[in-house]
Amino acid sequence: MFRKAIFFFLMFCTFSLQSQNLQLHFDPRSSIHGKESFQSDYMTATFEMFKPDQWGSTFMFVDIDFNLSKGNAGMIYAEFSRKFNINDFPLMPLIEYNGGLGVFEVDDNDVGGGYSIPNAYLVGISYPFQLGNVFMDTYVAYKYNAFKETSHDVQWTVIWTGNFASDKLTVCGFADLWTENKSQMNANSEKKVIFLSEPQVWYNATSNFSLGSEVKISSNFIQNSEVYICPTLAVKWNF
């Protein structure tokens, strides 16, 4: 019975994402929070791919932020995860990789240098379930943050997706809560707790084209302990 539930969960996710999609978001965070917090508003392109198979499922996404002058790309970030079925066992082992690269500009809009978003490697256990029309997944994982001085941490994630109004409305997103060292240079640094959530709402104009919004909610995430709420305007193409 549980394998049947897993099957329908995977099939639902496949239908919702139609294997893969491309999103384009306008992020007005500088207009909302001011240039003291964010230098500019910018566009973000997101590619998502979900692929289930008889052994489990693979999910990945890639974000590209066009946050440099003249709309040039300034950062790329990616996550890849794999979950595994174990017969009728209700939990699914999970592995995940996160990481990225970026560049920054100096005052004359020339590229001033580059930076790396430190790799993170996760190993944990996932539990998929259903609440009404909403299919959900939650996992707890050990997180290895590859800072200059390694940070050993834990992450809890909740993921949701559901269709309503005869599939014209899709609600989806995730919420992450994790720990990491306050200082990436000190292995004995105190820990901080970070929260990040990105709920999305989509109006599905056709089976391929959607209009919607994502609200980026973060606490203790962007170089300080402040809470930021950054809504976007977005379009999505499923293919």
Task: Indicate where each model-derived feature is located.
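Transmembrane beta-barrel domains of outer membrane proteins
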Residues: F50-P52, S81-K83, S126-Q130, I159-N163, ...
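Outer-membrane beta-barrel "beta-signal"
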Residues: Y228-F239
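Outer-membrane pore/translocation modules
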Residues: N21-D27, S37-D41, G71-I159, N188-S189, ...
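Short glycine/proline- and aromatic-enriched beta-strand/turn motifs that initiate or cap beta-hairpins
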Residues: L17-L68
